[in-house]
Amino acid sequence: MPHRIRILPEILTNKIAAGEVVERPASVVKELVENALDAGCGEIIVEIEGGGRRLIRITDDGCGMSREDALMALERHATSKIATDDDLFSLATLGFRGEALPSVASVSRFTLATRERGSIEGTEIYAEGGKIREVKACGMAEGTVVSVRNLFFNTPARLKFMKSVETEGGHVADLVTRLALSRPEVRFTCVSDGKTLFRALDGTLLDRVAALLGKTVASALHPVDLATEGVRVTGLVARPDVSRSAASHLYTYINGRFIRDRVVQHAILQAYRNFLERGRYPVVVLFIEVSPGEVDVNVHPTKHEVRFRQQGIVHDVIQGAVEETLRLTPWIRRSESPVAAPLAVPRPQQYVQGTGARQVEEVRELLENYRPAVAPHRPLFAPQPAPQPDREPPLPDSGSRMLDDTAVRRHGGYFSSLAVIGQYNASYILCQDGSDLVIIDQHAAHERVAFERLKTQFAAGRVEGQGLLFPETVELSHRESAVVREHGGELGRLGFDLEDFGGTTWIVKGIPRLLAGTDYLRLLRDTLEELQSLGASRSIADAVEDILTRVACHSVVRGEHPLTTGEIEALFAHMDATDFSTNCPHGRPVLQRLTLGEVEKMFKRV
């Protein structure tokens, strides 16, 4: 026989609500600390015992509550933060539903002590399992103290899902860290089992980061500040080498509220995509400010997820703000001490270690032509000759480079200011910056220059192409042929010129000019693979970036490549004029720095 529909008792509905709001001790801490911040406090003390299962106590010096308000606060959906439905779209507080206190009280032994500013005494309320047992006057400082004991004592099924004391305590510490980063003007203290985990005094955001994440992280952060299209993005972003294996150090806030939002995270990762290797995540503390009516925070019980009215605009502004800082590579510092002249500046021939004069001349001849000749026609599956080293379009020599010596000196960029010592293994350029030794990966540097050049050309309409003297036929799969037909426009903008020869056979008539002299058919197939992934989880912009990265990588020297003085100067001039110049498009570093102290330590001189 079917059961009749009935109204659930209030004690049961509170437990159901608690299941949505109170997932673990950290959830309780979040709700109570947010209430303290909404109360306008200047200091918050968070104390836990047994990972929060035995005790959670939150003390603040905020505005406090009267006896009547304190009792009303334990009723469901009782709040001072909203009054009409319009208020839901103009929220200026962290809490607004009026569910937290009754939900927490329903699954714990709960004590609320509060004293309103200007009152001569406070009020203390004790509740057990959601039922108020005692209300009395008390003496206390202005503010509020909430104590939660024996969490989930009346819901044993929930206790089974609790993790170890250490794990639950770690979640609480992480939660308090996120909240403390959002309000550097508020003092925070976090105590676990009588031990102070951290104490953060009021100060600047950088001070707060140093106190919570460490001075090493703080020293690697650089400011972000951009306001456009109704969105303002401020905060701090770390240089690429200070990265993590997980997204745990992405601290993002919308109108002061900590969020984990896929749109925001994607925008940040897009800005870093050519700085970090796959599987690495940056350290950022970002604050996004938009009109309250442009964001809906009433999406999830924990309020960690939000919905933007114009998410595309928000995404692009965040990405642009982070890229603006990364583009300037502010972490490159010039030594303040004068650059000492190298002991012996090698002549151009001396950069080539173990290479005879005849080989030097051959290399110079190869470098005379800025664009290599296109490889002669060969069938796709014909026997291949022994592989030759990949060649880059040579950097112009000292007599014909794009930026002459005057321009290099006039630019005054970081790379051009370095004193070149020589080459190591025909792959790394050794330089001196004051007393520091700077080692530059010439392949990574040239790859970044080529990549940024390709991006500029693509943004202007089309990557510079080059027609083949002997067009080449290529057999593609049916799927690859479909991709060519569907994305012919994108392929054309990327510098490829393909003509349908019938069936799945295509004629390659032109290629990106930077690919001349390389295995461009292999790259063509890789490009088609990238374009095949569109529509599932990738946009055309994502695919194009990856394709241009591949083109840049294939177009530059991979093996040992001796450089003359003029070529090094030209490369450095290009690097000074190139955005994001400290990392190659794959995220690998272009340069490493060793201080004199580090070198002396290697030799046990200090």
UniProtKB/Swiss-Prot annotation:
Lineage summary: Bacteria, Pseudomonadati, Thermodesulfobacteriota, Desulfuromonadia, Geobacterales
Listed GO biological process terms: mismatch repair
Keywords: DNA damage, DNA repair
Protein's organism: Geobacter sulfurreducens (strain ATCC 51573 / DSM 12127 / PCA)
Protein name per the record: DNA mismatch repair protein MutL
Region Disordered, annotated ranges: 377-401
Family statement drawn from the similarity comment of this UniProt entry: Belongs to the DNA mismatch repair MutL/HexB family.
Function: This protein is involved in the repair of mismatches in DNA. It is required for dam-dependent methyl-directed DNA mismatch repair. May act as a 'molecular matchmaker', a protein that promotes the formation of a stable complex between two or more DNA-binding proteins in an ATP-dependent manner without itself being part of a final effector complex.
The keyword rRNA-binding is assigned to this record: no
The keyword DNA damage appears for this protein: yes
InterPro entries named in the record: DNA_mismatch_repair_CS, DNA_mismatch_repair_MutL, DNA_mismatch_S5_2-like, HATPase_C_sf, MutL/Mlh/PMS, MutL/Mlh/Pms-like, MutL_C, MutL_C_dimsub
Disulfide bonding pattern of the chain: none
Gene designation per UniProt: mutL
One GO CC term, this protein: mismatch repair complex
Gene3D superfamilies, per the entry: 3.30.230.10, Histidine kinase-like ATPase, C-terminal domain, MutL, C-terminal domain, dimerisation subdomain, MutL, C-terminal domain, regulatory subdomain
GO molecular function: ATP binding; ATP hydrolysis activity; ATP-dependent DNA damage sensor activity; mismatched DNA binding
Record SUPFAM superfamilies: ATPase domain of HSP90 chaperone/DNA topoisomerase II/histidine kinase, DNA mismatch repair protein MutL, Ribosomal protein S5 domain 2-like
Pfam families cross-referenced by the UniProt entry: DNA_mis_repair (PF01119), HATPase_c_3 (PF13589), MutL_C (PF08676)
